[in-house]
UniProtKB/Swiss-Prot annotation:
Pfam families: GDPD_2 (PF13653). It comes from Loxosceles reclusa (Brown recluse spider). This is Dermonecrotic toxin LrSicTox-alphaIB1. Binds 1 Mg(2+) ion per subunit. Disulfide bonds join 51-57, 53-196. It is found in: Secreted. It is an enzyme of class 4 (lyase). It catalyses: an N-(acyl)-sphingosylphosphocholine = an N-(acyl)-sphingosyl-1,3-cyclic phosphate + choline; an N-(acyl)-sphingosylphosphoethanolamine = an N-(acyl)-sphingosyl-1,3-cyclic phosphate + ethanolamine; a 1-acyl-sn-glycero-3-phosphocholine = a 1-acyl-sn-glycero-2,3-cyclic phosphate + choline; a 1-acyl-sn-glycero-3-phosphoethanolamine = a 1-acyl-sn-glycero-2,3-cyclic phosphate + ethanolamine.
Length: 279
């Protein structure tokens, strides 16, 4: 049977030491917060207070130091290499910026990632990257990122980059933001809320419907932040591709239950995260 590849996404992995911790618990993907200074430079991997219930909100690194640690964790042959870690979501905290700084934020982000993660295109980290943007008005971050990689001579690295708008906006409005950004493909759609609160699956189901329709723009759907077995099963039953969690071992446990093992498998590097799964 054709099984849906699943991404177990470790939530709020902001210190280099946490990469090992989350992957060892079963995550094949991590989510990292990126804060910006007032000139739109990515500054720290930092969430801050408040954050998810039961988590320390204040772990951090300088962004470039995190990128170097992440590169080691995703470069075959490195002593810190994890074969399993195949996707990284950068949760871009652009709320501190003016809307007209989005392009610059994308440009500066691209320069940092190119140098410290991709090693200027010379055997850098291999993980796929999702740029997750909280505000539809900041779609020019994508443009700035893309144009910078091109002007720096590495347009091919865009093959490793996907996108997400994380504001739980109306799906049609999300589609329009991608039109404005000139994006076709590589689209992950998030839906969710902090683990301190409950959220139903109605918008997830809407996103799944878009993903599975012949004219949809979404390739993958993920739900956050899921820490309990029952809510994991509900999300899998709704057909998500990814689940973001504080407890990767809980998600891995559910995926190993016979009902889910028959229909899902843990995604590997050979699973293209920009490809819509066809049953």
């Amino acid at each position: 049977a054709n099984k849906r590849p699943a991404w177990i996404m470790g939530h709020m992995v902001n210190a280099v030491a946490q990469i090992d911790e989350f992957v060892n618990l079963g995550a094949n993907s991590i989510e990292t917060d990126v804060s910006f200074d007032k000139n739109a430079n990515p500054e720290y991997t930092y969430h801050g207070i408040p954050c998810d219930c039961g988590r320390t909100c204040t772990k951090w690194e300088n962004f470039n130091d995190f990128l170097k640690g992440l590169r080691k964790a995703t470069t075959p042959g490195d002593s810190k290499y994890h074969e399993k870690l195949v996707l990284v979501v950068f949760d871009l905290k652009t709320g501190s910026l003016y809307d007209n700084q989005a392009y610059d934020a994308g440009k500066k982000l691209a320069k940092n990632i190119l140098q410290h993660y991709w090693n200027n295109g010379n055997n850098g980290g291999r993980a796929y990257i999702v740029l997750s943007i909280p505000n539809l008005a900041h779609y020019k971050l994508i443009t700035g990122f893309k144009e910078t990689l091109t002007s720096e001579g590495h347009p091919e690295l865009m093959e490793k980059v996907g996108y997400d708008f994380s504001g739980n906006d109306d799906i049609d409005k999300v589609g329009n933001a991608y039109k404005n950004a000139g994006v076709t493909g590589h689209v992950w759609q998030s839906d969710g809320i902090t683990n301190c609160l409950l959220r139903g699956l109605s918008r997830v189901k809407e996103a799944v419907k878009n993903r599975d329709s012949s004219n949809g723009f979404i390739n993958k759907v993920y739900f956050w932040t899921v820490d309990k077995r029952a809510s994991t099963r509900d999300a899998l039953d709704a057909g998500v591709d990814g689940i973001m969690t504080n407890y990767p071992d809980v998600i891995a446990d559910v995926l190993s239950e016979s009902a889910y093992k028959a229909n899902f498998r843990i995604a590997t590097y050979d699973d293209n995260p920009w490809e819509t799964f066809k049953n």
